[in-house]
Amino acid sequence: VIGGDECNINEHRFLVALYDPDGFLSGGIL
Protein backbone atom coordinates (compact mmCIF):
# COMPACT_ATOMS: atom_id res chain seq x y z
CA VAL A 1 0.00 0.00 0.00
CA ILE A 2 2.70 2.43 1.04
CA GLY A 3 6.16 2.33 -0.40
CA GLY A 4 9.44 4.16 -0.73
CA ASP A 5 9.69 7.94 -0.59
CA GLU A 6 5.92 8.37 -0.69
CA CYS A 7 5.87 6.95 2.79
CA ASN A 8 5.51 9.63 5.42
CA ILE A 9 7.99 8.28 7.95
CA ASN A 10 6.53 10.46 10.69
CA GLU A 11 3.06 8.93 10.53
CA HIS A 12 2.95 5.85 8.37
CA ARG A 13 5.96 4.17 9.97
CA PHE A 14 3.94 3.00 12.96
CA LEU A 15 0.61 2.74 11.13
CA VAL A 16 2.01 0.37 8.55
CA ALA A 17 3.92 -1.52 11.22
CA LEU A 18 0.61 -2.23 12.94
CA TYR A 19 -1.38 -3.06 9.83
CA ASP A 20 1.33 -4.61 7.69
CA PRO A 21 4.58 -5.84 9.31
CA ASP A 22 6.07 -6.30 5.85
CA GLY A 23 4.89 -2.92 4.65
CA PHE A 24 6.76 -0.95 7.28
CA LEU A 25 10.03 -2.11 5.80
CA SER A 26 9.02 -0.36 2.61
CA GLY A 27 7.91 2.64 4.63
CA GLY A 28 11.46 3.78 5.12
CA ILE A 29 12.09 2.97 8.78
CA LEU A 30 15.22 1.15 7.76
UniProtKB/Swiss-Prot annotation:
It is an enzyme of class 3 (hydrolase). GO terms for molecular function: serine-type peptidase activity; toxin activity. Its EC number is 3.4.21.-. Expressed by the venom gland. Belongs to the peptidase S1 family. Snake venom subfamily. Monomer. This is Snake venom serine protease. The lineage of its organism: Eukaryota, Metazoa, Chordata, Craniata, Vertebrata.
